[in-house]
Amino acid sequence: MNNSLTIIGAGAWGSALAIALSNKFDKIFLVAKDKANTASLGTQHSALSRSYSQNIFIGHSYEVINNSKAVLIATPSSSFSSVLKSIKNDLNGKPIAWVTKGFDPETGNLLHETFNQYLPEHHPCVISGPTFAAEIVEEKPAAIVVASKDKKTRAYWSDIIQTEKLRAYTNSDIVGVQVGGSVKNVLAIAAGIASGLGFGANTQAALITRGLAEMTRLGVALGADKVTFQGLSGLGDLVLTCSDDLSRNRRFGKELASNISTDDALKNINATVEGFKALKLVMKVARNNQIEMPICEQVLLVTEGKTTPKEAVTELLLRKPSQE
């Protein structure tokens, strides 16, 4: 019986999942973007290199899908549609899910809509939640959400993803789980800005709470259940990403608070900042649906150089008082 898994995307999260799931599969095929990435993985991910000699096989060809029972996409949102286009003829009905967060940058759609465009015969499934890749590799306990409208698909992937250290919950609200996973990255930039400006716990609490309200408003407008945002993929992921410097988005915000340019801040992070990629898309979707997202709006203005971090905070504080 085939007991192999293909993970497409050999960044921090894809690599962490390969390590975490390596005891559950005979083989895990980790597909890197190109040969250059393949050659450098051993030095970039020391924990991965230790597992490589066992049952994690790193390559750059999608042909390994033929030897796998399921496929998990772990690429940035900017690569999501191109990956689907490349593999759609190789799946042959095999289960597929993704851990990618964000909106499709080409269309502004949630990723399950892009998925349905390329793979209409499959049930879309997203896996999301408050998880830092580094802590997953270190086998620190965590919880995650498997979301799909299809009950069998949820059950299948929750069984795959759950380990002794990673607890999987299921949710039928695939829209809400995706919105939470995308918007929290934008709000983490705001939290980083606040931290970089020297503000304290009061400010962080206000940002997280009011940020959650913005996330919920947008999600409900797109058809999500507001209860979803009280769970792991909403509040849980938001608290994690806003509160710890393992978050690239938070670190990016702290860089912006030092009054350097957006380009320089991105260079200093030297890794994918999904919140920055999602920012314009989130605000476009919000405006199209007439949803107020003042915190996210100010983050956008800061990244565009249209206001300073301090001015953004002042603008938020001077807004007309309103009911919570």
Positions of predicted regions on the chain:
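Internal alpha-helical scaffold of NAD(P)-dependent oxidoreductase catalytic cores
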Residues: 90, 114, 118-122, 141-228
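Rossmann-like NAD(P)(H) cofactor-binding subdomain of soluble oxidoreductases
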Residues: 51-139, 157-159
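General beta-strand structural signal in soluble alpha/beta enzymes
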Residues: 98, 123-128, 168-172, 230-231, ...
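NAD(P)-dependent Rossmann-like dehydrogenase/reductase catalytic/cofactor-binding core
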Residues: 191-192, 220-230, 234, 238-324
